[in-house]
């Protein structure tokens, strides 16, 4: 079992139940999924850039990435509906906990001048999103094979009803929030 999952079941559930006064174990918020998304606007001119992005995202997440396509045509961006413009991975269960562990303990500390993640990334429904400016912070990425620095968005979807509950859950899991 993943280290964070074990920590969640053994300690965090008990701690959150005490903090928020839940009457039932099923009320305790848990992480449902993590979505890692890489939006590549430059894929409009150069579709080849998507191949390397899919490969990198698969290496980071440990799971095959799907190519996302444009929902609408936007003339200003020379974009047609259905054109490939990015890639994403949805992680659940064991892989989700392993990815979160790597993100918190390995990748985020490698960010230059890292002071913690912003506490403003909550959406009001108990989900948290953060942006990563470069994919090089992940140890799975080979520095020599990088043709272009690409950023990515990471969304952590929780079953929490409020941002306060979600923040407490992530803090117990070790997410380094700025003060």
UniProtKB/Swiss-Prot annotation:
Keywords (alphabetical) are: Ribonucleoprotein, Ribosomal protein, RNA-binding, rRNA-binding, tRNA-binding
On assembly, the entry states: Part of the 50S ribosomal subunit; part of the 5S rRNA/L5/L18/L25 subcomplex. Contacts the 5S rRNA and the P site tRNA. Forms a bridge to the 30S subunit in the 70S ribosome.
GO biological process entries: translation
This chain belongs to the protein called Large ribosomal subunit protein uL5
NCBIfam families attached to this UniProt entry: PRK00010.1 (NF000585)
Output the Gene Ontology terms for molecular function.
Answer: RNA binding; rRNA binding; structural constituent of ribosome; tRNA binding
Would the keyword rRNA-binding be found if you checked this record's keyword annotation? yes
Q: Recite the lineage of the species.
A: Bacteria, Pseudomonadati, Thermodesulfobacteriota, Desulfuromonadia, Geobacterales
One GO CC term of this entry? cytosolic large ribosomal subunit
One Pfam family recorded for the sequence? Ribosomal_L5_C
Q: InterPro entries under this entry?
A: Ribosomal_uL5, Ribosomal_uL5_bac-type, Ribosomal_uL5_C, Ribosomal_uL5_CS, Ribosomal_uL5_dom_sf, Ribosomal_uL5_N
